[in-house]
Amino acid sequence: MPAEAADRPGDMADATIDAFHRGAFFLAQPAGRGHRAGLDAMILAGAVPTGFAGNLADLGAGAGAAGLAVAARCPDARVVLVERDAEMAAYARRSLALPQNAALRGRADVLAADVTLSGEARAAAGLCDRAFDFAIMNPPFNASADRASFDDLRKRAHVMPPDMFGQWTRTAAAIVKPGGFLALIARPASLEAILSALAGRFGEASIVPIHPRAEEDAIRIIIRARHGSRGGPALCPPLVLHHDGNALTSHADAICNGTASLFGD
């Protein structure tokens, strides 16, 4: 996902323009600071079925990586990039304005809104009840006790506030239609908190452990669950990212470059 040179107007002078899905779409991202999208966002996007057709909310979208990855792979998907940080929302708008993303622009929008809002405040911000068929989220999942960053933009993107999973899944349950889906990526240590937050809201949770290499412990989990279902969770076969070296496995490469879905659907 190399950075490419581009014209950078005004307050985007510190942006890099980065290719994803082997050039299927591009992102404007802050250079040398803040959160920069990578494999996590691409794997999360892979949790959406290739044949998905409907409205999808990318909650905490940042510059738009996961949502635009869905739009690039699913030609009938309509995506809203939801981001509360004004600076990152500006990068998401810049991403949509890139000429390389012209084919996606008619199916994607940016909404500056706080995912933790509730009730009338949430609806007034543009997150209306039952407006979406699918929601994805890559929320901050570093504990506040973890090594702190001196980069405020990065810290806002990475540090988990109290009851975050409860607040974010509450919003997802409000905006996703019954029978729709939520997919999220997190650390394995958060599994209990996530399942607790999903309880009574989303069921049939399919859990995919993400391993750097076959012999190494999982570093991420992907969970996909159905709104309104009472079905129990299921542990799925893992996704192994790398061979013994740093090259991606064929399965991981297909998912991360938009030619396959994580669940094979």
What is each model feature region?
Residues 1-22, 98-107, 121-129, 261-265:
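Short, low-complexity, intrinsically disordered N-terminal peptides in bacterial proteins
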Residues 4-51:
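Class I SAM-dependent transferase core
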Residues 28, 33, 37, 162-218:
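Conserved Class I SAM-dependent methyltransferase catalytic core
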Residues 139-167:
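Mobile active-site "lid"/loop adjacent to the S-adenosyl-L-methionine
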Residues 40, 46-149:
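Conserved SAM/SAH cofactor-binding pocket of Class I
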Residues 26, 78, 107-109, 203-206:
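Conserved beta-strand segments of alpha/beta enzyme cores
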Residues 44, 168, 225:
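Residue-level signal for inorganic ion chemistry
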